[in-house]
Amino acid sequence: MWRGMIVLAGLLSAAGTAHANSRYFCSADDKEARFTLESGFESDAGHKLNHFRGALIVKDEAQSTVFGKRVFESQHLTNHWSRDGELLMEVFDGGGDDTDGATLDLVVVAGERGKPTANFSGSYSLTIEGGEKPYAVEGKVSCGTK
């Protein structure tokens, strides 16, 4: 009887682990930009997005008048991938009346497939198009799991 209960407890705990959610956070602060991103995905097939939020400050004076400070929500996360230690996120801000038609695209690529760790690093690229002149920068990003 005890063996049966131990096996049942083991199966239930394994089932709970299989359905746990994945939460990631990434941040960067360099001469070009300062941002934080936080996302949560279901571990089930498809990795459905639970939540996403973030904030960005563009430090370039020419760009800061349009995209100086931005807050991101779930609708801004246009692409994401998280699997086996690798994380990719694309954040797109289509602007609006306050940007005179300019758009912002922030892409984060971090981690290494096959080497999952609690803390990992990578790179980001930030592109602003549609303004007076195109703006594109790259930098390093630090990420982790919660």
PLM feature spans:
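N-terminal signal peptide c-region/cleavage motif recognized by signal peptidases
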Residues: A14-T17
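Bacterial N-terminal signal peptides that target proteins for export
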Residues: M1-I6
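Central antiparallel beta-sheet cores of small beta-barrel/beta-sandwich binding domains
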Residues: N21-K146
